């Protein structure tokens, strides 16, 4: 089995792009407490929106879907799962809620990762929740002609418990040492987790739950207000491309994690920028039409009513609809299709 020692990251000479991304995120973290003092009730709306988006997007990445109406009902716990997809969506909802509410009390240990996986599959009848894989799994790639090939072979099942123990121990040791920036350490842990692929199913979703957990524990709570999973889903091609680049030669301990680190830092920074923009809109004393107009002016390309509602959580649905109609009549925006 390959070894895991994150102390080596301390000696890596990171390029200017990574250093610049880290510096910008540090700056936003410094302003984070100021953001959180603004209109708690409105910020709570951002939390509700982000929970729904995160639950929907993280599952959608894996092809687990239901209707927008059902997603909202499931996230609001106003209905029960009707099928396997909805069972797994409901499990993600619960696991994410557990992280939101109790991240300080979820240490990075194998036993807690297993418990989180158990929550993810608590509604499933498959009996795989909370257990490491018992059969060899593969990361496959489908070629243009439809042929499926094995792109990456994770660790064997018998190696998995020891490997997860090893990455947790090394991560905790380096976290305690404070010698490696968490923004570097966290993506390094996640790429190893994905390469180990410790479960029969749910590895991708668990990696995103763990990303949120690790960021929260390091003091980066932007994912509570702006969905990181949604940003990943919208850039899914880049997500998988950087994963593929960063897991190449992983089994030989010769992989380069730089592409995945850059991708994750870019995603976190984009979330902080969105958060600042939304807080700025919330702080203003503008009318509903002015808030919507401002949101529209700051949106590039096509957008939906839901996109605008996300940007102006202090404005009700009816007011957003009326404002968009007014802007359409004024010729500020054009409408495509219905809805």
Which residue ranges define each predicted feature?
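FIC/Doc superfamily catalytic core
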Residues: 1-339
């Amino acid at each position: 089995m390959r070894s895991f020692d994150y102390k080596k990251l301390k000696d890596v000479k990171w390029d200017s792009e990574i250093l610049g991304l880290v510096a910008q995120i540090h700056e936003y973290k410094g302003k984070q407490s100021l953001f959180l003092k603004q209109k708690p009730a409105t910020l709570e709306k951002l939390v509700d929106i982000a929970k729904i988006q995160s639950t929907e997007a993280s599952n959608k990445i894996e092809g687990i879907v239901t209707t927008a109406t059902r997603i909202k009902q499931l996230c609001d716990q106003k209905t029960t799962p009707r099928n396997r997809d909805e069972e797994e969506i409901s499990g993600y909802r619960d696991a994410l809620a557990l992280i939101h509410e109790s991240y300080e009390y979820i240490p990075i240990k194998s036993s807690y990762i297993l418990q989180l996986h158990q929550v993810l599959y608590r509604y499933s009848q498959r009996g795989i929740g909370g257990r490491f894989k018992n059969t060899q799994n593969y990361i496959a790639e489908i070629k243009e002609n439809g042929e499926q090939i094995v792109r990456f072979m994770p660790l064997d099942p018998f190696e998995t418990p020891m490997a997860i123990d090893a990455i947790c121990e090394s991560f905790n040791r380096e976290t305690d040492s404070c010698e490696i920036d968490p923004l570097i350490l966290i993506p390094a842990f996640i790429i190893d987790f994905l390469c180990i692929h410790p479960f029969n199913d749910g590895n991708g979703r668990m990696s995103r739950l763990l990303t949120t957990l690790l960021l929260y524990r390091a003091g980066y709570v932007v994912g509570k207000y702006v969905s990181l999973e949604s940003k990943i889903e919208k850039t899914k091609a880049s997500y998988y491309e950087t994963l593929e680049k960063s897991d190449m030669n992983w089994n030989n301990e010769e992989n380069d994690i730089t592409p995945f680190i850059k991708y994750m830092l870019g995603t976190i920074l984009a979330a902080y920028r969105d958060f600042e923009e939304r807080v700025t809109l919330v702080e203003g004393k503008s009318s509903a039409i002015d808030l919507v107009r401002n949101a529209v002016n700051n949106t590039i390309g096509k957008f939906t009513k839901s996109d605008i509602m996300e940007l102006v959580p202090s404005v009700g649905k009816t007011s957003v609809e009326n404002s968009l109609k007014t802007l359409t009549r004024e010729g500020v925006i054009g409408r495509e299709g219905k809805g």
